[in-house]
């Protein structure tokens, strides 16, 4: 798992904050004894109990080292060929080293990686002191994953010269002046350089162990103590904190969003853009300065026990660096991560003179409060319980049909996938599992009657994986609803969490956890969702790249296979209506300007993906930019007569968002970044609207052909 700047939904962002550069070489990191013990224990488990047991030998050692190097330097910007030769000389030693609890090999690789970061970025900053000649005809290979490693330091420096030149040209084309470009890039490289001084031993171990785990199979992972805690939080949808999305921006931990109903929002004392410069515990605890501190460390200080006090030293959003601070006290409380929970909306779809109400339920994850369920908490949170409540509300609002939006739902609890399917098909088998011994077990739901028997559709994309695929596949096999969108991810494997500390009887978290593949999913029709995923009944275009995203993009994915079909009876026959549904969809989108724009965007993106080299000549790049602007202007004129202004505004916003400003996310203003995200969401709505129209067609056809609808044998609506 590579360390990246990324948001952890609703409460924190785990990214690396930049600060004023430290002098001297980066710290030399060394493994701790407990890490070596955890690696040894993990190896024992993975070789004995994994669904695909792979011995830790010389062959696997070579794969692990290669994957580890790739995770550190995927685009080959930092190491040179001599470094790689040095690393691969250790290929046959890693397995023995792990069993002897010796992690010097991965740590020595990482320490050289830190050294190379400092060398390359120091050189990049030096290049900013000079200008560049953009009249020259030269190209830059900006996608380098398949390129050879630089053969020498001179070749590496020339690569970085082109990289900096391209960064400069992008800002220049966006209208930035030379000094502003120097300032922006100087800060960018300084921030990147500062990260080399902030890595910890735990970071190195996490990256290495993930390289080891994923070398066996793509969905096997190692989670250190911090990562394991975050995984537990994401599944429970709750934690104790202040209720704020935090993000690193220009050395500060910045409030990006306030969670409705959380302590931060209810206090009325915090606003989006406020910067946290200090954290103190309790009413009298000493204030700790957190400027320049890694954001995950800041989050650890803000989290705490329920009903305890945390004090924050705040630099207001509208204050300058020397502005007046304010000190606020907040009482920590249990925060529900509502933005990951199921939500409903109602879309009104017109079809000729008829108007239909489509209830849309968006489910980002199959979450479940495992502890709450085990303890018998009557109000524990889970995806199926929340969706059941939303279905009851939609029925009261008299919707004609229900659309389950599972786009980018990466899965979660298997139990929840089964229970959620039961809400729509009633009692019966949902999914089959085969373990490492070859035993096949059928998982089903015993709900006496479905919660919704009306028209149903499921919207999926390439990001719909695991539990999402179980649900979509079962709905498809039962003939219960129409599956719409892109082909799904193709993750048909079952993982379990192995707590290494519990196995070792440790009193405190020390060794972390393994997420280990132990079984494989199969549809009730006998085929697996592994590798091939779920093929939609009605396909919609999407931005995903199957060559780089999805199960088929992994070089060591488990193959597709098949078992005997389960004993089940379809409850409907939506397939019988698919030709008519497809025909209506095709006719409609031919006249839908917004949908046509979306298809053009997808085609353009696919063409750009094939482009791995870009010109560093200013005239050539301006010509490309002018062609793009001309295309967008022509599109705007063509759509000027559209009656649906809302959809047109969404498309225009998406177009605007694609204009290259040469900036990285944390270099834009917070308001600009949030506006860009809103525009991206608007682009997604084009597909959602069409999916709702497809479901509207389905409703009409089911009403005219009731024999294809869900039969009452499964019970009446609850």
Residue ranges of model-derived segments:
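Conserved functional hotspot residues or short segments at active or partner-binding sites
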Residues: 176-187, 523-524, 528-707, 711, ...
């Amino acid at each position: 798992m590579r360390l990246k700047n990324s948001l952890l939904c609703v409460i924190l962002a785990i990214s690396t904050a930049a600060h004023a550069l430290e002098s001297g070489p980066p710290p030399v990191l060394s493994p701790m004894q407990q890490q070596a013990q955890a690696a040894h224990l993990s190896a024992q488990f993975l070789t004995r109990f994994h669904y695909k047991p792979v011995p830790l030998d010389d062959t696997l050692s070579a794969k692990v080292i290669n994957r580890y190097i790739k995770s550190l330097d995927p685009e080959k910007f930092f190491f040179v060929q001599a470094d790689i030769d040095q690393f691969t000389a250790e290929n046959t030693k890693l397995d023995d080293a792990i069993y002897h609890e010796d992690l010097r090999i991965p740590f020595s690789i990482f320490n050289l990686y830190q050294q190379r970061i400092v060398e390359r970025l120091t050189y990049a900053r030096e290049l900013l002191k000079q200008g560049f000649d953009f009249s020259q005809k030269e190209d830059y290979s900006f996608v380098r994953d398949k390129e050879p490693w630089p053969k020498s330091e001179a070749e590496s420096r020339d690569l970085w010269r082109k990289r900096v030149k391209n960064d400069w040209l992008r800002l220049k084309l966006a209208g930035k002046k030379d000094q502003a470009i120097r300032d922006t890039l100087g800060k960018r490289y300084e921030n990147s350089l500062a990260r080399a001084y902030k890595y910890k031993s735990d970071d190195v171990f996490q990256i290495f162990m993930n390289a080891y785990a994923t070398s066996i199979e793509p969905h096997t992972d190692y989670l250190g103590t911090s990562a394991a805690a975050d995984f537990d939080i994401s599944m429970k949808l709750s934690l104790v904190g202040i209720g704020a999305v935090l993000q690193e921006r220009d050395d500060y931990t910045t409030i990006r969003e306030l969670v409705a109903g959380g302590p931060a929002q209810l206090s009325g004392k915090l606003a989006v853009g406020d910067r946290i410069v200090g954290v103190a515990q309790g009413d009298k605890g000493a204030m700790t300065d957190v400027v320049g501190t890694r954001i995950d460390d800041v989050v650890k200080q803000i989290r705490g026990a329920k009903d305890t006090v945390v004090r924050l030293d705040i630099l207001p959003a509208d204050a300058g660096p020397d502005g007046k601070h304010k000190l606020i006290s907040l009482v920590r409380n249990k925060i529900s991560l509502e933005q990951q929970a199921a939500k409903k909306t109602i879309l009104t779809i017109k079809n000729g003179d008829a108007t239909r109400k489509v209830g849309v339920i968006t489910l980002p994850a199959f979450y479940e409060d495992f502890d709450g369920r085990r303890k018998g908490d009557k109000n524990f949170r889970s995806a199926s319980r929340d969706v059941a409540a939303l279905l009851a509300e939609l029925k009261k609002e008299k919707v004609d049909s229900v659309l389950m939006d599972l786009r980018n739902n990466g899965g979660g609890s298997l139990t929840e996938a089964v229970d959620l399917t039961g809400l729509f098909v009633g009692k019966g088998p949902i999914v089959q599992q085969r373990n490492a011994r070859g035993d096949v077990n059928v998982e089903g739901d015993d709900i006496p009657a479905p919660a919704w028997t009306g028209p149903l559709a499921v919207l999926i994309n390439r990001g719909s994986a695991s539990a999402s695929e179980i649900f979509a596949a079962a709905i498809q096999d039962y003939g219960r609803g129409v599956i719409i969108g892109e082909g799904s991810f193709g993750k048909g494997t079952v993982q379990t969490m192995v707590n290494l500390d519990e196995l070792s009887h440790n009193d405190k978290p020390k060794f972390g956890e393994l997420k280990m593949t132990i079984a494989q999913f199969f549809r009730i029709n006998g085929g697996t969702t592994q590798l091939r995923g779920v093929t939609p009944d009605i396909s919609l275009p999407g931005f995903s790249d199957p060559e780089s995203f999805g199960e088929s993009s992994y070089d060591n994915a488990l193959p597709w296979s098949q078992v005997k079909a389960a004993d089940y009876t379809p409850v409907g026959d939506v397939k019988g209506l698919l030709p008519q549904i497809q025909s209506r969809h095709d006719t409609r989108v031919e006249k839908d300007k917004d949908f046509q724009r979306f298809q053009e965007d997808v085609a353009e993106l696919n063409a750009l993906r094939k482009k791995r080299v870009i010109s560093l000549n200013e005239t050539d790049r301006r010509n490309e930019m002018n062609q793009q602007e001309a295309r967008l202007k022509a599109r705007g004129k063509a759509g000027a007569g559209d009656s649906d202004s809302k959809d047109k505004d969404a498309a225009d916003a998406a177009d605007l968002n694609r204009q290259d400003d040469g900036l990285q996310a944390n270099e834009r203003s917070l308001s600009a970044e949030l506006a860009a995200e809103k525009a991206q969401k608007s682009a997604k709505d084009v597909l959602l609207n069409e999916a709702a129209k497809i479901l509207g067609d389905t409703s009409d056809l089911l009403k005219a052909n009731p024999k294809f609808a869900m039969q009452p044998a499964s019970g009446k609506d609850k």
